[in-house]
Amino acid sequence: MSCSRRDLLKNSIKGLVAASLPLSAFKILSPSQVKASVGDSNVRWVFLMDIQKCVGCGFCVKACKTENEVPYDVGVTRTWVERYVVTKDHKTNIDTPMGGRDGYTTSKIHGEEIDPDSITKAFFVPKGCNHCKKPACVQVCPVGATYQTRDGVVLVDRSWCIGCGYCIMACPFGARFFHPIYKVAEKCTFCYHRITKGLKTACVQACPFGARQFGNLKDENDPVTNTIMTKRVGILKDEYGTEPQAFYIGLDERVR
């Protein structure tokens, strides 16, 4: 696609306004609800994150940037880790410097020192694209550059993306950004080039504590499927109706 055609398409598309809904924490799913979301394909790739195991080391973020050619020192990333620190005054402090790439080695959050004695709870939350069953980003893309595979992975065709930004605005999880080099929409792809060859995603492979897992929800013998069906799992921002396929163990009500 030439630059002139891209500019023409960008300027000709008007009137789209992203819906604004109030933030909420999460929804706990029953096994029957999870099974209802798997679709018709023989494969349904899903992520499982265990907050109780995440230590905020940032290895996953580093691995993702390296694997997927996201500039290392630019403040955008396909996956990130947030730190939540709750204090005695019931304040929840949240930060993710450089997406948590370098881990969390200071008690400062946004330049403010947090008194260790005031902390009542602290934890880390891995985030990224939720590869929703009903992705809002796919619905709003005016040229079909954002699409969903039969096995549930949401991808972006760089050769078709016109950089209008509608998908970035539509994503309720903040999982999309403009690639600083290619000038197109960018996001997690579940390392599709790896999983289609039987390999793990870069972030899962890099996680030293098993906080990130990846599996096929259609395979009853998959360890990830077994965990999702037998443990208390939740999803983020259920109120948007996108049916996220990223599941969490140990979600706190403060996570949004």
Predicted regions and their residues:
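Long, compositionally biased charged/polar accessory segments in the mid-to-C-terminal portions
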Residues: 202-256
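Exposed loop/turn and edge beta-strand positions of beta-sandwich/beta-sheet ligand-binding modules
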Residues: 43, 123, 150
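Residue-level detector of secondary-structure transition/capping positions
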Residues: 16-17, 23, 211
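C-terminal segment of N-terminal export signals and the immediately downstream linker at the start
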Residues: 2, 23-63, 239-241, 247-248, ...
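N-terminal secretory signal peptides and thylakoid transit peptides that target proteins
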Residues: 1-19
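Cysteine-centered iron-sulfur cluster-binding motifs in ferredoxin-type domains/subunits
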Residues: 47-63, 67, 121-144, 155-174, ...
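Short flanking/linker segments adjacent to small metal-binding domains or redox-active Cys/His motifs
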Residues: 108-110, 123-130, 138, 247-256
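Non-heme iron-sulfur electron-transfer modules
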Residues: 28-39, 67-117, 147-162, 175-196, ...
